[in-house]
Design a protein with these regions (language model features):
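Long, charged, mostly alpha-helical binding arms that flank functional sites
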Residues: 1-87
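Basic, alpha-helical terminal appendages of large translation-related enzymes
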Residues: 46, 56-166
Length: 166
């Protein structure tokens, strides 16, 4: 959420307050699919420990992808701001896709924190937590909400906000 937050004086093209349009990278899309299928399989078998393990591995991988991609974007942006914006846009597309799916997967375990994430996505919970949309790309999901990709605004997140500290 902080990555797209509008900042006065920041000329970055990614700071629109909206989830950026675009397709998740092949690595992120594959991780999403594997996590959803693995989680679904584990839950079907009532292997809750395995389902949580799938989520843990997915979240750790998503965090590493975000860390690596955002650092690369910042480094590239010092020499070529347009290239930095392109890389940051892709990092954000991946991060929002992975966060949405992780939130759906973890909703049964930590409902309050996940519902707070949904609130800051500014999407109705009925749509956000629907398994009908879990494997859709973010662009497909935003279109299903009746909006154009790249135009869905998220709520402004307060500084140092923790969704799970309650």
């Amino acid at each position: 959420f902080y990555g797209v937050a509008e900042r006065e004086g920041d000329e970055s093209l990614v700071r629109t307050g909206c989830i950026p349009a675009g397709s998740a990278s092949a690595e992120a899309a594959d991780a999403i699919e594997q996590a959803v299928l693995g989680f679904e399989d584990a839950m079907h078998r009532f292997e809750f420990h395995r389902a949580l393990g799938v989520c843990d591995a997915f979240l750790r991988g998503a965090n590493k992808r975000w860390s690596d991609a955002s650092k690369a974007a910042k480094a590239a942006g010092t020499e070529d701001p347009a290239r930095g914006d392109d890389l940051m846009t892709q990092a954000l597309v991946d991060a929002f896709a992975e966060l949405r799916v992780a939130t759906v997967l973890m909703h049964g375990v930590v409902p309050r924190g996940c519902e707070l994430i949904c609130e800051y996505f500014d999407i109705a919970p009925e749509a956000f937590f629907s398994w009908d949309h879990v494997l859709e790309t973010t662009d497909e999901f935003v279109r299903a909400l009746g909006e154009e990709p790249g135009s869905h605004r998220v709520k402004v997140l307060p500084p140092r906000f923790d969704f799970f500290a309650y």
